[in-house]
Amino acid sequence: MVSILTGFENINKIINCCITREMTENGLLEDVETFVNTYYNEGQVEEPIIWITQHPTTASRQADISQTMELTTPFEFDCGVYDVDLEDANMQSQNLANRVILSVLKNWQTAQAELLPGQRMIKNITLDRYSPMGYVTVTGKSDKVPVTGVILNVNHIVNWTLCCRQLNNNED
């Protein structure tokens, strides 16, 4: 368990690491050309593309500021692949979404151990939703790119007592 003072940003780092770690030669996502990990992107994108969005964190059970609190942070991955044949492109975008899930499952424990040595923040990761969402249009092209969306819930624990101790130590 970690404190809320360092916890939330580390969850984002861990999930991003799971993806970038597999975007290497012989990685599960070696074919991915663009990984967008911000809410808004003005730059040029090439497909295959993975666009990640972190949704609001909520209490997993009734909010109680006691010693520990279980929280859930959903991460949405929108995966798109272009192909002249829309049916093939749709299958390829679903395959990319499957590989994103595998990348997170394969790497989250190692990434967490490297970023937070000796600490365990993430309890588990669960699948919330898997949906072939439809298509997006690409500026300058008349073609559409099929997109498959995946939402993974990162379930984590915050230790409020540890937060208070860290705050008190910083005041000394």
Residue ranges and their predicted role:
Residues 1-40, 55-172:
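Charged, amphipathic alpha-helical segments and their flanking helix caps
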Residues 48-52:
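A short glycine-rich, His/Asp/Glu-containing loop-to-beta-strand
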